[in-house]
Amino acid sequence: MSDVLPIILSGGSGTRLWPLSRETYPKQFLPLVGEHSMLQATWLRSAPVAAHAPIVVANEEHRFMAAEQLQQLGVKPSAILLEPKGRNTAPAIAVAALEATRNGGDPLLLVLPSDHVIRDEAAFQAAVTVAAAAAEQGKLVTFGIKPTAPETGYGYIKAGAGTGATAVERFVEKPDLATAQGYLASGEYYWNSGMFLFRASRYLEELRKFQPAIADACQKAWEGGKRDADFTRLDKDAFASSPSDSIDYAVMEKTADAVVVPLDAGWNDVGSWSSLLDVSEQDGQGNAHHGDVIQLDCKNTYAYGSRLIAMVGLENVVVVETDDAVLVGHRDRIQEVKEVVSQIKSAGRSEATWHRKVYRPWGAYDSIDMGQRFQVKRITVKPGATLSLQMHHHRAEHWIVVSGTAEVTRGDEVLLLTENQSTYIPLGVTHRLKNPGKLPLELIEVQSGSYLGEDDIVRFEDTYGRT
């Protein structure tokens, strides 16, 4: 389609899908429905209508995951813009629009959250075609989801008369149940999907008109950003000075050119484990299970795990198992998992933020055992990848190669280790690990010392800009 540029919004922590989704590995990077992550699925459904590779707006912490997941699809993004701090959707889209026009172009921006499920991709693409025609005429298009129930968790859009792209009469906040029932019965209202399409210049024009403080802060943040490798780091102070506002409040509710295009395509924003059950393939009793699950006489249950889960006589129950946490809850109250996450944070525990397995740009590590003055990790290093040149003040390390080849820098020495060989890194000695081979390197690391936290790392050189 002519000049459509997807803008994929990939911020957010997805705490309502804890323990699978956590701050350092949120839901948009997980394959919750199908084989691809939600970020990957967002690009794949938009690719047939796109004339450009996407611009991704992401959290600094998630930059390598976003780049790698698109790379797995053979896609090099037009840009990856890194937010130093979340400021809601209006600023995020503003910096994306500035980036989209930096070389003199003025594409149609297809703004897509990275964590939605859309079952009927053909219907979605047809709606984008209708929206693009309206955007070509200077309209700012939002996609309205045809409601299937009187949901109170969504905002609503009242549409004007007509078919195709029709004028937005008003945006409505999340209603109470009686009001939502009236909206559903009237046939005049749609759920607000959070997806948009408009010309980049038109969005910036309307933003400057209605929210000049956001426009000015984003201009400074983008102009003062630092570009390195595949990423653009927005200026921290300038971006933080922007008011935090959604595109709905900042622009769409104020502009005279807002139109809505209906979308009936099996949309779901996957805001809870209960909604994930709704979009998952179910058996005859309404059960949806992912992983190694055995159930007897269960109804309307959802289970997700890597180890064996056995369920007997349960109804309307959600069970989610990970390496270091298990969630069990009634489907009607599963949204309260956010309170659980708050309590975990208040207790100073790491499970709200980190998985046991932590992904890094060079690979991953899994903390398989830990005790007083020791920790054992399984480390995987990608072919050709190199860890930082570093040292530790409080711990020594023993490395045992399980498979692959390791090039180890230890002080002034450079060692080449293969399967079943090992080395020792004394406390205070500079060291580096590299995989010079074509296969993944796996090793076991045994740490010992008085303090084993990840912040006991002094980096001297780093391929990934973390020094």
UniProtKB/Swiss-Prot annotation:
<dbReference type="InterPro" id="IPR005835">
    <property type="entry name" value="NTP_transferase_dom"/>
</dbReference>
<dbReference type="Pfam" id="PF01050">
    <property type="entry name" value="MannoseP_isomer"/>
</dbReference>
<dbReference type="GO" id="GO:0004476">
    <property type="term" value="F:mannose-6-phosphate isomerase activity"/>
</dbReference>
<keyword id="KW-0511">Multifunctional enzyme</keyword>
<keyword id="KW-0413">Isomerase</keyword>
<dbReference type="InterPro" id="IPR001538">
    <property type="entry name" value="Man6P_isomerase-2_C"/>
</dbReference>
<comment type="function">
    <text>Involved in xanthan production.</text>
</comment>
<keyword id="KW-0270">Exopolysaccharide synthesis</keyword>
<comment type="similarity">
    <text>Belongs to the mannose-6-phosphate isomerase type 2 family.</text>
</comment>
<comment type="pathway">
    <text>Nucleotide-sugar biosynthesis; GDP-alpha-D-mannose biosynthesis; GDP-alpha-D-mannose from alpha-D-mannose 1-phosphate (GTP route): step 1/1.</text>
</comment>
<dbReference type="GO" id="GO:0005525">
    <property type="term" value="F:GTP binding"/>
</dbReference>
<dbReference type="InterPro" id="IPR051161">
    <property type="entry name" value="Mannose-6P_isomerase_type2"/>
</dbReference>
<keyword id="KW-0547">Nucleotide-binding</keyword>
<keyword id="KW-0808">Transferase</keyword>
<dbReference type="InterPro" id="IPR011051">
    <property type="entry name" value="RmlC_Cupin_sf"/>
</dbReference>
<dbReference type="GO" id="GO:0004475">
    <property type="term" value="F:mannose-1-phosphate guanylyltransferase (GTP) activity"/>
</dbReference>
<dbReference type="InterPro" id="IPR049577">
    <property type="entry name" value="GMPP_N"/>
</dbReference>
<keyword id="KW-0548">Nucleotidyltransferase</keyword>
<dbReference type="GO" id="GO:0009298">
    <property type="term" value="P:GDP-mannose biosynthetic process"/>
</dbReference>
<protein>
    <recommendedName>
        <fullName>Xanthan biosynthesis protein XanB</fullName>
        <ecNumber>5.3.1.8</ecNumber>
        <ecNumber>2.7.7.13</ecNumber>
    </recommendedName>
</protein>
<dbReference type="InterPro" id="IPR054566">
    <property type="entry name" value="ManC/GMP-like_b-helix"/>
</dbReference>
<keyword id="KW-0448">Lipopolysaccharide biosynthesis</keyword>
<keyword id="KW-0342">GTP-binding</keyword>
<dbReference type="InterPro" id="IPR006375">
    <property type="entry name" value="Man1P_GuaTrfase/Man6P_Isoase"/>
</dbReference>
<dbReference type="GO" id="GO:0009103">
    <property type="term" value="P:lipopolysaccharide biosynthetic process"/>
</dbReference>
<dbReference type="InterPro" id="IPR014710">
    <property type="entry name" value="RmlC-like_jellyroll"/>
</dbReference>
<comment type="pathway">
    <text>Nucleotide-sugar biosynthesis; GDP-alpha-D-mannose biosynthesis; alpha-D-mannose 1-phosphate from D-fructose 6-phosphate: step 1/2.</text>
</comment>
<dbReference type="Pfam" id="PF00483">
    <property type="entry name" value="NTP_transferase"/>
</dbReference>
<dbReference type="Pfam" id="PF22640">
    <property type="entry name" value="ManC_GMP_beta-helix"/>
</dbReference>
<dbReference type="InterPro" id="IPR029044">
    <property type="entry name" value="Nucleotide-diphossugar_trans"/>
</dbReference>
